[in-house]
Design a protein with these regions (language model features):
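Intrinsic structural disorder/low-complexity segments
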Residues: 24-25, 184
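Short, flexible active-site loop motifs that bind/organize anionic cofactors or intermediates
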Residues: 10, 28-29, 125
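Short, small-residue-biased leader/transition segments that mark boundaries at the very start
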Residues: 3-4
């Protein structure tokens, strides 16, 4: 749950080397989600712990490194977050979730997909700066992929269209400050 969804966007988690080596594979190497693959596999087999103490921080801006390695260049455009980069990333996310669920014969992919929908604001917001027409097309593609499973997806979508990213970020930041943490949806 929490460990799995948070590790995608924030670095800083640690997996024991001997545990990770057991699952070494090229399956998800160029996807940018190899760390998630290792985390999922090791958490299924070994005890895991999660701490809410912040030890890393994501800073907005700068040049993204997606597509910088040779194995990623066929999937991602280096130096920018294009619509296709975002869609490819989210498609790989689904492939990985489905692979893990099939591998372990459970419905974790359905649970994770619903959770992704509930917390899809950053996934939507990252492309809002491209204009309404492009943003609507991007959101349509996410819906087709299955990311619109909760009403939260639509709240974020319409709020981003009506209020824009800057106002939405302010509202979210204010709510987190009032509540003291990210709301449990």
């Amino acid at each position: 749950g929490d460990v799995y969804k948070r590790q995608v966007f924030v670095s800083g988690f640690t997996i024991r080397r001997d545990c990770a080596l057991e699952f070494e594979s090229e399956k998800f190497d160029s996807s940018l989600l190899y760390q998630m693959y290792l985390l999922a596999e090791t958490c299924y087999k070994y005890p895991a712990a999660y701490s809410r103490v912040i030890i890393t921080q994501a800073i907005e801006g700068g040049t993204p490194f997606f597509g910088s390695s040779e194995s990623e260049k066929a999937i991602y455009t280096p130096g920018t977050i294009t619509i296709d980069n975002s869609i490819n990333f989210m498609a790989w996310y689904i492939k990985l979730q489905d692979y893990i669920a099939k591998e372990h014969n459970d419905d974790s992919n359905k649970i994770l997909m619903l959770n992704q929908s509930k917390y899809s604001y950053p996934v939507l917001e990252i492309q809002r700066n491209k204009g309404i027409k492009v943003f609507r097309e991007y959101a349509r593609r996410l819906k087709e992929m299955g990311y619109a499973q909760s009403f939260y997806f639509y709240i974020y979508y319409y709020a981003l269209i009506v209020l824009g990213a800057k106002n939405c970020r302010f509202i979210i930041k204010t709510l987190k400050h009032i509540i003291g943490h990210r709301p449990q949806l």
